[in-house]
């Protein structure tokens, strides 16, 4: 049994999973410490309130509110779980966007800009095509594909600059992020799409249901009543599986990873490294654009364009999602859901305790920073793994009896035939220098 556990621990996949879990646990523990410190500094938060805050951090998704006596109640909260899945959609997609680029040796910090371009095109198509003349389902599909295409084209720009001019993709992505932010703001400012103005806001609110376009629920609203969840989460999961198959089971995925491992060696092996760099960033951009389309085409969300003079946080949150998943597309599904769970936990902290909504951002920030330590934890676990393997080998060697190490020779010496050695070939004598030649 001990040997089986040692073999399981020695696997590289086990080490990666443990590193991510330890990073998450450390983040939650530090987040709890932050909650306690804030509670001690805030007079209106009691000791009982601090304890409730810590409990909500670890199990807030299962909180159902308070009973008549004011105590927290626990159980399966379908609304919370549904909203968590809804918020996980864009996080899964931006996490995939960052992970695909990482696999090719690139750092796609341009996911926010690609997400914004997907927002611009998907909303423009959903609100611009009249639903009176075109079926709503066709409009939704065109808007979704348009968002993916816009993200792909925006992501290809840093890829081209990297492949052709060797410009660092991080600098190029930062540049395109702010161009996208201002472009989206300007385009919606001059647009004539159908909108509604709320008296408390100075900008315009856009919602795809104004044109009758919304992602179908497929019965998920009955499974999670009162929540915003729709079929978009299924699309996100399917896309994650498709990305996994492409990256792990196809020649194209192997070429992308080969370029990420060593671009120059891949080129010498005949792999078109420049083409793969551009395609990798384009695919990453398409995934980020798809995340924006799934979120804004849901029919539940209202796009307020004035807020996008800043970059959307969901694009940057894709980075810790990918890091915690160790760039594995399947693991991105779970880390994206985990990050969405933290959002729901923050709402529970705000609604059920005296903490304000900003405490959640602090906790998420702590976990984001600690996600970068997952690689360090992997290195520490690797050292531990080598030690366990050495100890296991010593134990295995010690269990071998001494007489079994050198088996006795049962054949009598006189029965061993003589094996004649081949005679060395005769080398003709060379005549002395200056002598006569034969």
Locate the predicted segments by residue:
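Alpha-helical transmembrane segments of multi-pass membrane proteins, especially transporters
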Residues: 16-20, 48, 83, 87, ...
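Interfacial/capping segments of alpha-helical transmembrane domains
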Residues: 30-66, 193-204
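Transmembrane helix-bundle core of multi-pass membrane transporters
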Residues: 177-249
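Helix-loop-helix "hairpin" substructures at the membrane interface of multi-pass membrane proteins
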Residues: 225-303, 329-330
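Transmembrane alpha-helical segments in multi-pass inner-membrane proteins
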Residues: 285-289, 294-365
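Hydrophobic core segments of alpha-helical transmembrane domains in multi-pass membrane transport
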Residues: 19-36, 94-98, 119, 123-125, ...
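Single transmembrane alpha-helix segments in multi-pass membrane proteins
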Residues: 34-40, 56-129, 144-148, 152-167, ...
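Cytosolic-side transmembrane-helix boundaries in multi-pass membrane proteins
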Residues: 1-27, 32, 36-37, 261, ...
